[in-house]
Amino acid sequence: MVSLLVNPDALQKIAQKREFSQIKNSLLAKSNIDYQDDIQPWLNNEITLAVTTLDIDRDPDNGLQTGYLMALATKNPVKSREFLELLFSKRAFAGNNLEIERYKGVKVIYDHQEYSASQISNSLAGAIVNNFVLFANHPQVIKAAINNLQAPDLNLVSSLEYQKASQQIPKNSLAVTFFNLPEISKWQKLELAESTYHSQILSLALNSQGLLAESTFLTNSQIVPPSLPLSQPVAALQYIPESTTLAISGANLSNLGNSDLAKLWKQGTATIYGSSEDGISRLIQPLIKIQQNLNLNFSQDIFTWVTGEYALALLTNSENAIPNWVFVVEKTPQLAAGIAHLDNIASSSGFNVISLTLNGQKVSAWTQIITTNQNNQSINLETKVKGVHTTLNNYEIFTSDLNILKEILSQKQRPLLENPKFKNSLGIIPQPNQGYIYLDWETGQNLLQHQIPVLKLMELLDKPLIDNLQSLTFSSYHNQPGILTGGVLLKLN
């Protein structure tokens, strides 16, 4: 179920007026309906679209015939009734056979034909019930909606799951979406793998920085956060450069695999891609490439000993498709053993573990000596740096590039915490929370879309929104029994 809780004209605050007009015109292109003349005079502040049943006739032998219902709030019943009659009269002139039926006191008008799975997608039924204009792809869907209205214990509002989820909806929401996850999986012919979460409610709200999308997942299982909630951004972010394209920060990676976020990730990726491992490789290609380049397994070789604060950043690399990276870890009793383990992996992978001095700072490096041949005559030796790390104050800083470490040590570039786009986002994301994931869309759009294919899909789905996008900031918060809530702030121009 998707509900738009404002008049569509108000959405011009998000999309440019020209772009919004194009969207409205494309939706009505085949109906000979003019939005401004025929719909705008009566349309009020709610439009709801729902998948009400997976199979209208409940006969699996003739395939799934999904039932769709649209409800539009009206502020002028006379005008909306005129619109309904106009719409169906145009369908009659186009050659459709119409039928009018009284059902429980409600006038239902619909295309009269034998409904096959292919015909249902082009069929239409309509009615006016109280202050709503109803449309569906089959009269049975309209009748079921009337039954639900007259028998409140049958409708969605009476569902305990919906009541629990709807309590999390912000009061200023522009739109709300509710998903019954097992039913959604059946509809899309997906197998709901590792089904920890059974329901989801998503809301959209405008604020001074852009658009906040909050999502709440419901489960009957115990919620296990990866760490104690953080009341402020981790101090490790002070060593992450302002020009960062992607930054991930939080605390205690050692418990990440058993956390609520990990279960949600596994459920989503396994359902969509068939396995959580395949989903990870498709969605976070940059991290997978870094892992392969260093012969590491993040969960086994790093996460186990990171029990304090951490911050990971990806930066664009003009010389290589693999982005540069920075990883900052708070000092803990487990740190020394963790570094020794990484040194052993580097040595066993054929890298040299050496020490050097940079800006008066002792630095350890993992290097590889390779040969270069010039003009088939002289052979030169070249040292290739795979990674460097050093201790600074209460943190260990790892990076892929010696020049990046030099900039961090010399403080030539402001930290991410002083980046206005990131800093302003922090005031919108609720606290306490589990940390942040930050994407700078303006500086890293090409890299991110190439390395994270799902972001390319976002642009295809909503180009006007993406064209005005500056950055995205994700976080998880409001952990309550059986509830996981998180949000993403889309900072807009």
Predicted features along the sequence, with ranges:
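Leucine-rich, highly hydrophobic segment in Treponema pallidum outer-membrane-associated proteins
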Residues: 120, 128-129, 136-138, 145, ...
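C-terminal/domain-terminus segments
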Residues: 271-272, 327, 457-461
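Structural boundary/hinge residues at secondary-structure and domain interfaces
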Residues: 1-65, 72-95, 216-317
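Generic detector of solvent-exposed, compositionally biased contiguous segments
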Residues: 27-38, 104-115, 188-192, 284-301, ...
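Short secondary-structure boundary/capping segments
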Residues: 17-20, 149-152, 192, 220, ...
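Single conserved position on a long alpha-helix in the C-terminal lobe of the eukaryotic protein kinase
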Residues: 40-162, 304-424
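Short C-terminal domain-edge/linker segments immediately following a structured domain
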Residues: 30-37, 101-104, 164-168, 246-247, ...
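Residue-level signal for secondary-structure boundary sites
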Residues: 10, 78-80, 142, 185, ...
